[in-house]
Amino acid sequence: ALDLTTADLLPEFKALADDLDPGLRLTMDGQDSYGIPYNVEGYGYIVDKEMIAALVGEDNVDSFIEKYKTATYDEFADFVEKVNAYIKDGKGNDFALSGQTFSLLAEKNEKAEKLEGVFSVAGSEKWTYGDHLINIPIDSVFPNVAAAVNATDEQLDKLYNPMVAYAKTLDLITSHAVSERGPEFINSTTNGYDAAVANFANGKTLFIKQGNWCYTNIKNANSEIVDTLTILPIKMPFEQGDIAVDGLTVEHMNSSIPVFCGNYYVLNKQVSQHELEEAQKFLVWLNTSEEGQHYVTEEMAF
């Protein structure tokens, strides 16, 4: 692979490569850079705003989303319990987010009646909680990939409390999922990715923990809801003492969504100079032209 920081590049491509956010670089030591992002992914709790309206009323949707973003983990956990009880017995209860009180509607409408669980979880898909969700506690100790790759024993020891917070969060999600925990929960035939997406898209759950890559799957399952979807931050019960990254706070971690790059365009340094130049021109066009950006954001749904 060609190191974009030292190679002789076309000026337009060099500008594109140099403009990459350091956190999105394909790097092993924090200095080199070997790729241009294929896409940028972000994940959290995907929710249909119309389902929020079915729970707290249409007039309260915007304030719910605003207050949710800055709510604590304890407030979120209480909200999950209240919604779970609402699904099971239909009793409306009050809950607070960022100190503001909301009330679950006394009578369920048709949309709320369809709810069977708070979360849709693809239990058989280990990447959803083993590759993605677990990155949140890792981010509390390591500022970037290079730091994690070169971790010391002392840094690894600092992961203990963040991992406990992760386990509590995972327990909250799976214990309030539409699929019951047990052997069937990790059965790929009955509780895989497609089944989880279908449960959410068809209104059986309030949340699904996924990212923007899920858009096309949700659209294929139920195109009527894609225009009213949003992504909310994942909450974890961190203490400030658990955070080892300078300048990072519990409030920031619980009010923002993780953004990362999982795939890259990499230039093969073994090919001809002509092929290298054509590849650079293509990537410049794809990432800077109006037509190229249209394909990335609209056709590829990134």
For the regions a protein language model found, what residue spans apply to each?
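Extracytoplasmic "Venus flytrap"/periplasmic binding protein-like
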Residues: 1-19, 50-55, 59-62, 206-207, ...
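Extracytoplasmic/periplasmic solute-binding protein
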Residues: 25-39, 43-45, 74-151
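A local structural motif
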Residues: 60-67, 171-191, 204, 224-228
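Glycine-rich, aromatic-lined ligand/substrate-binding cores of catalytic
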Residues: 170-175, 195-218
